[in-house]
From Swiss-Prot:
Its EC number is 7.2.2.20. This is Zinc import ATP-binding protein ZnuC. Induction: Transcriptionally repressed by zur (zinc uptake regulator), in response to high extracellular zinc concentrations. It is a peripheral membrane protein. It is found in: Cell inner membrane. ATP binds at residues 37-44. Gene3D superfamilies: P-loop containing nucleotide triphosphate hydrolases. The gene is znuC. One of its GO terms (molecular function) is ATPase-coupled transmembrane transporter activity.
Amino acid sequence: MTSLVSLENVSVSFGQRRVLSDVSLELKPGKILTLLGPNGAGKSTLVRVVLGLVTPDEGVIKRNGKLRIGYVPQKLYLDTTLPLTVNRFLRLRPGTHKEDILPALKRVQAGHLINAPMQKLSGGETQRVLLARALLNRPQLLVLDEPTQGVDVNGQVALYDLIDQLRRELDCGVLMVSHDLHLVMAKTDEVLCLNHHICCSGTPEVVSLHPEFISMFGPRGAEQLGIYRHHHNHRHDLQGRIVLRRGNDRS
């Protein structure tokens, strides 16, 4: 399968500070890669490398031709005094045709929000509008920077269901950054744990049959949510230095 984007041993430094060290990954059509890591681990920098906004000091980046990327940012800052409807917000995107706006909103089950004020949207509604905006250029790759931040569990389940539906319909790759170190989208194909370098990688644990999980999140939540168990052979001290463990640590 041809990669949309591949990174090979990519490193990035800002001044004397090494932010990313020897990071490698592949983003493929129809596949979801979830990136986990603590605050300050370099996740946002890695996203900017994938988007082409940061040039690495070392390593190789390969992109598939004229790759179309749809990006959903971590946060949206709007002037609360500025009257701005969803329709107007989406039309601000360069190259957008007004006849494409409602179909994009309907695709993310948000057609009813077209005339709603942006400032009045809930966290989940805002994420759907941003996702609709990302779909306007018919992306081959969706980059979602913490799409479930500020969204309750039911909203997370609905968003994960929608993301899975979109990747199947569009056959697009998905890079998703998560602020939760353990709870991830169950249908993720690969999970990478980042702390300036790749600490570990794997797949989510199937938990849909666990009675405790079903009772906590319901049948639909158990289907869409998964647990990622880390398997590190090291830890990071307070200065960020790597300290090797005697045996693999799972958490």
